[in-house]
């Protein structure tokens, strides 16, 4: 008679090193816009480094064939206006899912995708699959037009922008606009010219009059409301709201990196 037991298989040294490298890159690029090879762009999810966040499944043909994947961001082909949801598999390969065309194999690692591949292999469809949320519900995505993508990129021109030439380096100036976006498309708010101190109206005792004080208070309150509206989630961020569902039940593994 003999006894047998099972134990959790440890990762190979190469896969463990790839997992550590991928985790470091994602934590450094969380919430940033990255320029891809060929002029395309990718936006990394802000909470991509948190354990158990933004995971889902792909349903393949056949009985009970599910692939556990981690959502890491969105990639945009600026020339054609195509949009891809980016996922990492268990072996840290990068996949792109496009509504209508299915699942695409983009690169064997996140480093290769950001540094060399980009969206150049986006037409290599792996298999016809269905994207599911963490609660195994079908994922529905509205189709965006090219003008919508250009408007979105123009709005994101003032966010943190990172070049793939220095993935883990310092963030470039926020005024650096993404490749392929004309400067005329970026809307700027005009600042009214200020008057010299000698021409400013003053009341008694050198204090500003009551009307000027009320106007100043209204301006400050208006700027506060505008700042709150800018910080609120946009319609584009709500497109993948179901992808951020975090099911913490015991049925699903919490994270790739543990």
From Swiss-Prot:
Pfam families reported for this sequence: DUF1314
InterPro entries named among the record's database cross-references: DUF1314 (IPR010741)
Transmembrane portions of the chain: none
Biased composition annotated in UniProt, kind: Basic and acidic residues: 214-240
Biased composition (Polar residues): 163-176
Region annotation Disordered: where it falls in the sequence: 163-258
Protein's UniProt name: Gene 3 protein
Record lineage: Viruses, Duplodnaviria, Heunggongvirae, Peploviricota, Herviviricetes
């Amino acid at each position: 008679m003999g006894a047998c037991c099972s134990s959790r298989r440890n990762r190979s040294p190469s896969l463990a090193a790839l997992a550590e490298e991928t985790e470091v890159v994602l934590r450094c690029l969380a919430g940033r816009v990255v320029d891809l090879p060929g002029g395309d762009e990718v936006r990394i999810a802000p909470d991509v480094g948190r354990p158990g966040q933004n995971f889902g499944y792909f349903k393949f043909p056949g009985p009970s064939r599910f692939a556990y994947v981690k959502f890491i961001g969105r990639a945009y082909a600026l020339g054609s206006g195509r949009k891809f949801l980016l996922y990492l598999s268990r072996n840290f390969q990068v996949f792109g899912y496009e509504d209508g065309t299915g699942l695409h194999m983009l690169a064997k690692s996140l480093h290769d995708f950001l540094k060399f591949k980009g969206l150049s292999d986006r037409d290599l469809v792996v298999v016809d699959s269905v994207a599911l949320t963490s609660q195994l519900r079908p994922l529905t995505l509205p189709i965006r037009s090219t003008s919508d993508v250009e408007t979105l990129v123009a709005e994101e021109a003032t966010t943190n922008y990172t070049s793939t030439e220095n993935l883990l380096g310092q963030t470039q100036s926020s005024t650096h606009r993404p490749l392929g976006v004309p400067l005329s498309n970026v809307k700027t708010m005009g600042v009214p010219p200020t008057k010299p101190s000698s021409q400013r109206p003053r009341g008694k005792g050198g204090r500003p009059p009551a009307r000027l004080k009320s106007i100043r208070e209204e301006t400050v309150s208006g700027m506060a409301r505008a700042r709150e509206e800018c910080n609120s989630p946009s319609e584009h961020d709500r497109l993948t709201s179901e992808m951020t569902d975090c099911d913490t039940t015991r049925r699903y593994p919490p994270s790739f990196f543990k």
